[in-house]
């Protein structure tokens, strides 16, 4: 990590990125941690998803992932357009096994309020890499503006450029800037799911064998079907398509150092 340590130490522009902490969406600080079921987001589980057993949370995982499937392509395009000169790298939605493991892990979400999968605020995610500090600052301005469209806003920022030398040493002086944003997609879920491609993605998900090898086919199909029915319900069709998404912003030297 010594080359990255020197790069940060010797470059005032890079160190200046430590100041980038845009204001978060009003109402978040007073209403607890950022979650997908936060009132400002609105992805609460349907009443039919009973939380007295893990079955309800299992269905909720499918519910969130199906919503993310429908929104992933629009999200990636929005970020690519907002990021200016940044090199955008899209990602697949977060995996089922990862979300289940986090919900049950004692050092993760096990003791959080149900539905615990609501803590996954990176189901939709991507990365944008910039060649220099000036273009990175401009790109972050564009991403913050994207976040603040409609009823959305900045949810949380993790600024690795603000870490002390000792803290940065724990990750070999790798630094990045990460933002979770409440994204308003400007349409209802009904409008999003009426599109042929989004509807096809959901149908493909329901027909496919379990993505998670630890999930029996029968349980996977049962819970996925229940989630799809809830997502396609009349109530959900009128709800604005809003979701917490994540974007990681990098400077090229940090990306190259990881290869």
Residue ranges and their predicted role:
Residues 110-259:
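Long beta-strand-rich cores associated with HINT superfamily self-processing modules
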Residues 1-120, 134-137, 259:
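Charge-rich, low-complexity segments
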């Amino acid at each position: 990590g010594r080359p990255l340590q020197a790069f940060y130490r010797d470059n005032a522009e890079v160190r200046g990125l430590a100041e980038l902490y845009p204001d978060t969406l009003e109402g978040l600080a007073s209403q607890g941690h950022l979650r997908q079921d936060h009132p400002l987001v609105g992805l609460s589980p349907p009443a039919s998803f009973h939380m007295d057993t893990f079955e309800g949370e299992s269905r909720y995982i499918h519910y969130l992932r199906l919503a993310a499937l429908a929104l992933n392509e629009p999200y990636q395009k929005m970020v690519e357009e907002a990021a200016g000169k940044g090199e955008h790298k899209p990602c697949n939605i977060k995996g089922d096994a990862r979300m289940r493991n986090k919900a049950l892990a004692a050092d993760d979400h096990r003791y959080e309020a149900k539905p615990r999968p609501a803590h996954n605020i990176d189901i939709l995610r991507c990365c944008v890499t910039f060649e220099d500090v000036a273009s990175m600052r401009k790109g972050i301005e564009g991403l913050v503006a994207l976040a603040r469209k409609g009823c959305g806003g900045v949810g949380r920022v993790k600024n690795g450029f603000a870490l002390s030398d000792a803290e940065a040493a724990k990750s070999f002086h790798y630094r990045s800037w990460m933002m979770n944003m409440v994204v308003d997609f400007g349409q209802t879920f009904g409008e999003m799911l009426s599109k042929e491609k989004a509807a096809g993605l959901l149908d493909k998900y329901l027909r496919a064998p379990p993505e998670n090898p630890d999930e029996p086919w029968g349980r996977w199909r049962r819970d996925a079907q229940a989630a799809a029915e809830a997502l396609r319900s009349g109530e959900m069709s009128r709800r604005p398509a809003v979701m917490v998404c994540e974007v990681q912003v990098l400077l090229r030297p940090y990306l190259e150092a990881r290869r």
